[in-house]
Amino acid sequence: MKGTTKTGNKVELEFPINTSPGILFKRLCTPHGLSEWFADDVNLSGNIFTFFWDGDTRKAELVDKKENKCVKFKWLNDNEQESEGMLIFKLQTDELTGETSLTVIEEISDDEDVDETISLWNHQIGELKRLIGA
């Protein structure tokens, strides 16, 4: 992990990843790609992603996607109407080194532990790196 920022209820983590933005992007915005590292299974209906983990289910609406640059999800509550925060993946390539970095930005609720959230993302991004051989 390259950098961590905690602002209010938002956690921002930056990870250098040794791969091309195109390879990484497919793992961030498709059900198959996300199910390889982020959740046990992922379904897509319209622009609503359903994520499954060990008996837990969460839904998120894909609200923005820019090829090889950014993927933005809005977490939904049970009735799929209200936002429960955002999850944003940003990709950047350093012009001098060619290194790709992935920034994860997640809004968390007051009762969520920031350190636990950071630990979870470190683990998940470790899985992603292992998967793509980075």
Write out the residue ranges for each language-model feature.
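Short, charged low-complexity linear motifs
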Residues: 10-11, 22-23, 100-108, 133
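Hydrophobic-ligand binding "helix-grip"
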Residues: 52-97, 105-109
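Hydrophobic ligand-binding cavity/cleft-lining segments
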Residues: 1-43
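Hydrophobic pocket/interface hotspot
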Residues: 24-28, 34, 49, 62, ...
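A short, polar/proline- and glycine-enriched secondary-structure boundary/capping micro-motif
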Residues: 36, 82-86, 111-117
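A conserved amphipathic terminal alpha-helix motif
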Residues: 107-134
